[in-house]
From Swiss-Prot:
PANTHER family: 60S RIBOSOMAL PROTEIN L3-RELATED, LARGE RIBOSOMAL SUBUNIT PROTEIN UL3. GO terms for cellular component: cytosolic large ribosomal subunit. The keyword Cytoplasm applies. Transmembrane segments: none annotated. It comes from Kluyveromyces lactis (strain ATCC 8585 / CBS 2359 / DSM 70799 / NBRC 1267 / NRRL Y-1140 / WM37). It comes from the Eukaryota. Pfam families: Ribosomal_L3. Keywords: Cytoplasm, Ribonucleoprotein, Ribosomal protein. GO terms for molecular function: RNA binding; structural constituent of ribosome. This is Large ribosomal subunit protein uL3. Belongs to the universal ribosomal protein uL3 family.
Length: 387
């Protein structure tokens, strides 16, 4: 027999244990960027829905690279980002054990979209959520003003409660996603005033992110169910003549300690994990009401970001959207949280100015020969189905 090694590096990363299903489908932001009071008040994250992927062409601006000033083709992800609605504000107090919630103030009127989030069965419920709370505004809102004054006096961190407008997306879901987003910039009083002014009002994505910015994406990955140890951990397949299976771990531990260690690779859940993907460059923040939001300086074709036939398993995008470089966690239709980067990225890729030359809007189902219906009609002529 040839030389055989009796040791090897372990298979699989132990830094993401336990590999189990996420508690919620929405990506939860556990850390926000550091606050800078010299800047104006602004949100630090946003909610959107993953629509699908496409392809772009641009000139690389990277001196020293062999592809400098040459065209490159890159994969991008399109995130549908209808405006979010501000419905509340939360004040946090710093304690020796971390942040503690001081109080929460809700807006006077909440839509049924967000009220559904508080019910397990909306149709069988009495739909009385927040009826008593909204009565606080009847008496000139004195009690609400006192709670806001408490936040201004004692709180050190201010976060707003926002929800998505899921009815503006192609999704059949009626229940909005509710999230807590930190406000950065200005004093605590300025943050509370900003939150109160935006109660029951919408905030667009272009007021949070801009082109060429590096952001993070927090989402739940695509689920794959119960998976074997070879695919789940990448362990080596055993020799052909191995007794009772090849895609297994031959030794799962010593006699003593008389239990299986937590670090041993085992079969189980793969996917549907909560993950944060960092440093995605924003290639474009598009407007939904622009009929040429997929046009560029080099491609003057009047077309929208929605490809022919719509995004597969999603549909058409009629709202504002964000184009991000590369792929992001999650499946189509999944809610994703876009967060400002926690640190200032000074790499060449982060500082590079991106100018898109062409955005692919061909059908994502099949070969995709045509970019617009007009181009298809000009090539094929009048079809029998159009008569």
């Amino acid at each position: 027999m040839s030389h055989r090694k009796y040791e090897a590096p372990r298979h699989g990363h132990l830094g993401f244990l336990p590999r189990k299903r996420a508690a919620s489908v929405r990506g939860r932001v556990k850390s926000f960027p550091k606050d800078d009071q010299t800047k104006p008040v602004a949100l630090t994250s946003f909610l959107g829905y993953k629509a699908g992927m496409s392809t772009i062409v641009r000139d690389l601006d990277r001196p020293g690279s062999k592809f400098h000033k040459r065209e490159v083709v890159e994969a991008v992800t399109v995130v549908d980002t209808p405006p979010i609605v501000v419905v509340g504000v939360v004040g946090y107090v710093e304690t020796p054990r971390g942040l503690r919630s001081l109080t929460t103030v809700w807006a006077e009127h909440l839509s049924d979209e967000v009220k559904r989030r508080f019910y397990k069965n909306w149709y069988k419920s009495k739909k009385k959520a927040f009826t008593k709370y909204s009565a606080k505004y009847a008496e000139n809102g004195a009690q609400v003003d006192r709670e806001l004054a408490r936040i201004k006096k004692y709180a050190s961190v201010v976060r707003v409660l926002v929800h998505t407008q899921v009815r503006k997306t192609p999704l059949s879901q009626k229940k909005a996603h509710l999230a807590e987003i930190q406000l950065n910039g200005g004093s605590v009083s300025d943050k509370v005033d900003w939150a109160k002014e935006h109660f029951e009002k919408t905030v667009a994505v272009d007021s949070v992110f801009e082109q060429n910015e590096m952001i993070d994406v927090v989402a739940v990955t695509k689920g794959h169910g119960f998976e074997g140890v070879t695919h789940r951990w990448g362990t080596k397949k055993l020799p052909r003549k191995t007794h009772r299976g090849l895609r297994k771990v031959a030794c799962i531990g010593a006699w003593h300690p008389a239990h299986v260690m937590w670090s041993v690779a085992r079969a189980g859940q793969r996917g549907y994990h909560h993950r944060t993907s960092i440093n995605h460059k924003v290639y474009r923040v598009g407007k939904g009401d622009d009929e040429a939001n997929a046009a560029t300086e080099f491609d003057r074709t009047k077309k929208t970001i929605t490809p022919m036939g719509g995004f597969v398993h999603y549909g058409a995008i009629n709202n504002d959207f964000v184009i991000l470089k590369g792929s992001i966690p999650g499946t189509r239709k999944r809610v994703v949280t876009l967060r400002k980067s926690l640190y200032t990225n000074t790499s060449r890729k982060a500082l590079e100015e991106v100018t898109l030359k062409w955005i692919d809007t061909a059908s994502k189902f099949g070969k995709g020969r045509f970019q617009t219906p007009a181009e298809k009609h000009a090539f094929l002529g009048t079809l029998k189905k159009d008569l």
